[in-house]
Amino acid sequence: PTYEMTYKKKEVIRPSHLGLELAKDKHASNGTNEQDLMDGFTVKDTQTATFDETWRPVWGETATIRNHYNELAVTLNQASMQRDIRIRFRVYDDGMGLRYEFPQQQKLNYIVVKEEHTQFAMTGDHTAYWIPGDYDTQEYETVISKMSEIRSKMKAAITSNASQTQFSPTGVQTSLQLKTDNGLYINLHEAACVNFPTMHLNLDDKNMVFESWLTPDATGMKGYVQTPFNTPWRTVIVSDDARDMLASNLILNLNEPCKIEDTSWIHPTKYCGVWWEMIAGGKQWSYTFDLPSVNLENLDYSKCRPHGQHPANTENVKRYIDFAAKNGLQEVLVEGWNIGWEDWFGHYKDYVFDFQTPYPDFDIKYLNDYAHSKGVKLMMHHETSGSTQNYERHLEAAYSLMNKYGYDAVKSGYVGDIIPRGDYHYSQSTNNHYLYCIKEAAKHHIMVNAHEATRPTGLCRTWPNLVGNESARGTEYEAFGGSEPYHTVILPFTRLQGGPMDYTPGIFVTKLSEWCDNKSYVHTTLCGQLALYLTMYSPLQMAAD
């Protein structure tokens, strides 16, 4: 099957192929007799529909959002395998989405996806605003170049990160923003990525064709699917006015309505916290230098000598609480409150944290009581060190602890390579982990701000307790040499298409030497930092320093 797309009589997508390559795998219903879902189809049925609604987001930039589209659902029969698939298109004034649908059938019950081959054939050598394709990180600076220059600029675009896995010299990530010579703005992304890997794009730079490239898991396969099943939407937003790209709600509209019945506990939040003084290099997340390694099952921190550089302590956190109360901030984040930070990173270690036990100098009950007496709440911090399986083992107890002391929001982190070992940050299984945490948090009336997780695809409509994601190069990099001045004015067109970003602005002390021995300067002005609160929309905003 193929499709093409025009906008105001201008060609946007040239005829482009659709389909999925399936593995001849013993876990599939058809085993080694499996055939690809690429060709050999005949049209069995077509159905059209029009839909128009106005819905109210729990939070957002507007009080209401209109969801108005025309729909075409094409059922295709693959006679050689005696099975049907459906490709559904939804067309909006500002773009379209398409997805593959697999009704349950005898010959289409369990399938193993080897690769998806959804193409986006461009009409020319457009200007692209891109970051390197990577299975583990989105924390790259945006490169502005012609599509034909991606290959030559890729090596320089790849900068060091705690966990990174590139896959192609012309592979890029979505949301990908493009600008044509004839005045069109085009954005390629995905919506409603549920139980499926994150999609990247690989460029055939001879023919100017982008093709989907899914994130594998540790087995090398891309997805294990039980029908009935729908893939995420593959989206194209288009306009001849750049401002329309920022106003588009296409990604949100392609997601399911809110699944949380009572949303009264979900609220916008301004916060400060114990974070920047560690990022800038002056203080430590850890409590002691006595330990060459940590075994949480057999360790008494009360016998360790504190190194005196641990800001997540009772007296210092009280200062932040007082500041928040005085300045109208609702919450105070405290990183480094819990035991285990002495060897938390870089060892592929499974049991790094228990997410429940504070260091000796952090009085969790007293500080929460003190904060509540001031009309402020503490914000929880759960760094996983990439061990999703350890986090899931402790998740119920960790969320219950939050309920016990009155926390209503958590900042989670996934720094480092993913455990189970060999998996990636954006695989099907890891994406399922992120959503599992969000769903479990909703049961406990907890809002989630996930850092180092997969880039958002509009799931905050369905699960509005997902109030923030990082999923891009944020303010912390200003302590590591900084970002290009244009970085923050491109992100709204790229990263923010799928949902808000916890960019953590609010750096007013721009000479880092005032914090520590760091000789870097924050590449900003006071006015620029204040402007970020408007241009980088999020219901969750930090006053970082």
Region locations from a protein language model:
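Glycine-rich, aromatic-lined ligand/substrate-binding cores of catalytic
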Residues: 511-545
